Amino acid sequence: MELTQAGATLYAYAREILDLHRIAKRAVSDLVELVTGKLTIGASFTVGEYVLPRILAAFTRKYPDVKFSVIIGNTEFVHEHARDSSIDVGLVEGLVDDPQLEVTKFLDDELILIVSKNHPLAGASVSPEELEAKLKDVPFIIREEGSGTRLAVEKALEKLNFKPSNMIVLGSTQAIKESVEANLGVTMLSKWTLRKEIKLGSIKPIRCCNPFKRGFYLIQHKDKFQSRACAEFIRFILEQTLRLF
């Protein structure tokens, strides 16, 4: 059976219509799948300065249409902003106990006891029993109240039964590192903050016991609407962070 001229013409147009329908459907699907929008991220100092930049760089390469606004403070500061929903997601050091928040660990951390390369104990192994005697006259430099690092360090010192007699409080990890390099005192900091200095040899660890482990956590309000961009950012952090470091 052969189509009439009118039928052949109609058939050609019908095929074009079907092809256009498939193209339009694919285009709409691509638009729906496109991840766009703006995220407001809160990060504690350690995470915001030493971990988050690499995550954002990798995420932006994959999702260039997502824009970011990042606020940085200590863990208590980020916790408060997550509670009042003024940020989409927070990244903090130390476990946050709050029934209003979803809390998920995304990276392991370790606290390292460090001194200047010129300190007599640089690179030494010291038993916990010897630690207080050897460091009793050395200022211990620590972060401010409300810092997740400070809380973790206080717990570590308690386990070591080490009570520094002279403590210097500084509100910046970088300031603490500079002070240790200048041989002002001793401190404990996250391993993620010390990669460059240890590689350069300007700061040396003191090995005194088993590693002090902690986690970095992702926090967000349970009742806050989660945009597609936010969902993809969280998924990216949980799936890709370990590969970036």
Task: Give the predicted meaning of each segment.
Residues 6-13, 51, 55, 127, ...:
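Short amphipathic alpha-helical coupling segments at ligand-binding clamshell hinges
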